Regions:
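Extended, highly charged alpha-helical segments
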Residues: 53, 58-93
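Short, compositionally biased low-complexity segments
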Residues: 35-43, 65-73, 150-155, 170
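Active-site-proximal flexible loops/turns
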Residues: 10, 43, 74, 138, ...
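Switch II of P-loop NTPase G domains
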Residues: 1-33, 37-60, 108-118
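ATP/adenylate-binding site constellation spanning eukaryotic-like Ser/Thr protein kinases
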Residues: 1-4, 68, 123
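C-terminal-of-GTPase-core extension/linker across diverse P-loop GTPases
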Residues: 77-171
Length: 171
């Protein structure tokens, strides 16, 4: 596991950690999105309000924008015959989905190998981890409900990172 600082809106254009963040997640095999799903006046949120569904949407958008940039550059090279016709076709298919705001999906192992080799992020397996406070861990919150509603096909796990942190300190 590699802990990489969060992504902010505009990262695909270099804002926040921007391209540094995106280059870090290119190296991982899967992406675990840890989103805050609890209220606390002691911990401020980067956007001043807690909305994990919006936080996830920001990440998804930035990943899609990054993938669009990668594919567009590769297609320009493809026109110079640096890619096979099959590779160009695959990229053009993925471009259609990405332009609609839909993450790229792979159809087979060879396609996955090719798309991974060029650094597409949207094809990586993902898990959403909702970080809750201890009292809502078993029941969830309105925030977890929003995440489940907006991402019904994603793997979602509820945890209390505070409890995990306390347990890790025990000898």
């Amino acid at each position: 596991f590699v802990d990489i600082a969060g992504l902010v809106k505009g990262a695909s254009k270099g804002e926040g950690l921007g391209n540094k963040f995106l280059s870090h997640i290119r190296e991982v095999d899967a992406i675990i999105h840890l989103v805050r799903c609890f209220d606390s006046e002691k911990i401020t949120h980067v956007n001043s309000k807690i909305n994990p569904a919006d936080d996830l949407e920001t990440i998804k958008t930035e990943i899609i924008l990054s993938d669009l940039g990668i594919i567009q550059k590769k297609l320009e090279k493809g026109k110079k015959k640096l890619l096979s016709d099959k590779e160009i076709k695959i990229l053009e298919e993925k471009l259609v989905f990405l332009n609609k705001g839909v993450e790229a999906k792979v159809n087979n192992e060879k396609e996955e190998e090719f798309l991974s080799s060029i650094g597409l992020l949207s094809i990586k397996p993902k898990i959403i981890v909702c970080n809750l406070d201890e009292e809502n861990l078993s029941s969830g919150t309105n925030y977890t409900s929003q995440v489940e509603k907006k991402y019904p096909n994603e793997k979602i796990i509820n945890i209390c990172a505070d409890i995990e942190d306390q347990l890790s300190g025990l000898d």
